[in-house]
Amino acid sequence: MAIKKRSATVVHGASGAAAAVKNPQASKSSFWGELPQHVMSGISRMVPTLIMGGVILAFSQLIAYSWLKIPADIGIMDALNSGKFSGFDLSLLKFAWLSQSFGGVLFGFAIPMFAAFVANSIGGKLAFPAGFIGGLMSTQPTQLLNFDPSTMQWATSSPVPSTFIGALIISIVAGYLVKWMNQKIQLPDFLLAFKTTFLLPILSAIFVMLAMYYVITPFGGWINGGIRTVLTAAGEKGALMYAMGIAAATAIDLGGPINKAAGFVAFSFTTDHVLPVTARSIAIVIPPIGLGLATIIDRRLTGKRLFNAQLYPQGKTAMFLAFMGISEGAIPFALESPITAIPSYMVGAIVGSTAAVWLGAVQWFPESAIWAWPLVTNLGVYMAGIALGAIITALMVVFLRLMMFRKGKLLIESL
């Protein structure tokens, strides 16, 4: 019979009463065990905001730059003021401007939503406002107050936003702080409303303000600024290294937390017009297309079926979902045989994404698959990168499965 470790030891005092003594090691393990769940809670609530903002933003660009043929170096507002549009085209352009503005606002709420729900998952609904405020300050930090000795005057300056790094740190800290304060601050029943609607919100807001201003924004901004400086200074080599890293992080867990973190990094660079989102968008679709393709070519290449019966229809489904920008269709393959699937689609995603970036494919619009393809610069090269990555993925997984089958390490259920 398995005996589970207890998180507390019962000690009997002189009076015979039992007292629970916390085990620090168990509490530490519990913290690290629960933390990924809290982070995923924030990510799952943030994704709809990202999708809404991204799709509406992409739609505005589709109207302006594909349908109305506005030159890529001209903004929508400049096009409105050019006097070249009238009637229905002018109405379309106005709608494109509205979609761009609204989509940008929605997109800007993604990180605050993430931070709010991470804090909420940790500290309950009382921690939600603190998390939201912290997430908002990570994208729109408070101005820095500086004294200029030359003019003997105070002036303000804009710090580098801490973005995802800052939101992650402040949401966790604020969540546990509110949870601790709620447990430790004991008031009479008639003051509970005062505690939950005034005292805890004010204390947590002051903490977030001070922590973000003096610690988290400088730290996160320093990291973000350093990364951008290095990538910009490295030029083409930096862009290729960035593409490889983003592609690997995007593909590795097929929509999981690492993928979402890579999305935050990529989108922050894209919205600030530092680096395009090309590599991430390509890496999203390569794994499901490649694994789906493997179920089609395995018998033609090897003379035998190398996948279990249920994976063949799932391969076709994965390919279809890939064109919708959904990589989760590849998950059954990764679960069934991670040793063959994960290395294959990782290599395919890295090679295909990097090749497309190196050959000049550019995508600035924060969406993937068919939703953004009409807005890609050098679409032919972009699609060639997807094809290259998918073919590499398919060939690798077929070859690895064949090797394992011949060694007797792969059991295949026949159709």
Curated annotation (Swiss-Prot):
A single MF term (Gene Ontology): protein-phosphocysteine-sugar phosphotransferase activity
Keyword Transport: yes
Domain PTS EIIC type-2: 35-415
UniProt main location, coarse: membrane
Annotated compartments: Cell inner membrane
Gene Ontology BP term (one): phosphoenolpyruvate-dependent sugar phosphotransferase system
Membrane-related topology note: Multi-pass membrane protein
Protein origin, superkingdom: Bacteria
InterPro entries on file: Bacterial_PTS_Sugar_Transport, PTS_EIIC, PTS_EIIC_2
Keywords, sorted A to Z: Cell inner membrane, Cell membrane, Membrane, Phosphoprotein, Phosphotransferase system, Sugar transport, Transferase, Transmembrane, Transmembrane helix, Transport
Topology, Cytoplasmic side: 1-46, 123-126, 179-197, 259-276, 340-341, 400-415
GO cellular component entries: plasma membrane
Regions crossing the membrane: 47-67, 102-122, 127-147, 158-178, 198-218, 238-258, 277-297, 319-339, 342-362, 379-399
Periplasmic side: 68-101, 148-157, 219-237, 298-318, 363-378
Function: The phosphoenolpyruvate-dependent sugar phosphotransferase system (PTS), a major carbohydrate active -transport system, catalyzes the phosphorylation of incoming sugar substrates concomitant with their translocation across the cell membrane.
Domain notes from UniProt: The EIIC domain forms the PTS system translocation channel and contains the specific substrate-binding site.
PANTHER family in the record: FRUCTOSE-LIKE PERMEASE (PTHR30505), FRUCTOSE-LIKE PTS SYSTEM EIIBC COMPONENT-RELATED (PTHR30505:SF0)
Name of this protein: Fructose-like permease IIC component
Origin organism lineage: Bacteria, Pseudomonadati, Pseudomonadota, Gammaproteobacteria, Enterobacterales
